[in-house]
Amino acid sequence: MSIEVNNESAIAADEAKLQRLAGYTFDIMHVHPDAELAILLVDEAAMEQLHVQWMDEPGPTDVLSFPMDELRPGTEDEPSPAGLLGDVVLCPQVAQVQAETTGHTLMDELLLLMTHGILHLLGFDHAEPAEEREMFGIQRDILVGFARYDRQH
């Protein structure tokens, strides 16, 4: 699998941990091992520009996802096809404010946001209550499982 992390923000982040979580998420969601993902960390100005351009919304946001080949989760017997999953763009400055509000670390917030972004790339959404329950449940399960996995490795 190809997971590229590019930090263009002024805030340091554990890029290796972001890559490990992305790989773990690929495994859990049965994404083909040759799938490609780009993770980009940008400052508030760059995120605001993307948010306006692609979502027609003012101000910076925490995470944006840009799907490419519209890959979907696979199964253990039949993983998703290989392809370009897409890009997840994170804004550490916005994430920092959210982390302080919720009482956890910036890195925990970035891990949550990246998982959220990958799930969007895999076709999950949270526009409707049932979709939200499903997506957020999967997101929680991935993060809890990854915390255990990462401690053991």
Swiss-Prot record:
Q: How is the cofactor bound?
A: Binds 1 zinc ion.
Question: Which GO biological-process labels does this protein carry?
Answer: rRNA processing
What InterPro entries does this protein's entry cite?
MetalPrtase_cat_dom_sf_prd, YbeY, YbeY_CS
What GO molecular function annotation could you give as one example from this UniProt entry?
A: zinc ion binding
What's a Pfam family this protein contains? Answer: YbeY
Asked whether the UniProt record includes Hydrolase among its keywords, one would answer: yes
Explain the purpose of this protein: Single strand-specific metallo-endoribonuclease involved in late-stage 70S ribosome quality control and in maturation of the 3' terminus of the 16S rRNA.
**What keywords does the record list, in alphabetical order?**
Cytoplasm, Endonuclease, Hydrolase, Metal-binding, Nuclease, Ribosome biogenesis, rRNA processing, Zinc
Under which main EC class is this enzyme filed?
hydrolase
Keyword Zinc attributed: yes
Binding residue positions for Zn(2+): H116, H120, H126
Domain of life, per UniProt, equals Bacteria
GO cellular component terms, A-Z = cytoplasm
Localization (cell)? Cytoplasm
Enzyme Commission number, as recorded: 3.1.-.-
Q: Which NCBIfam families match?
A: rRNA maturation RNase YbeY
Say which family it is in.
Answer: Belongs to the endoribonuclease YbeY family.
What SUPFAM superfamilies does the record point to?
Metalloproteases ('zincins'), catalytic domain
Q: What is this protein called?
A: Endoribonuclease YbeY
Cofactor dependence is on: Zn(2+)
- Disulfide bridge partners, by residue number: none
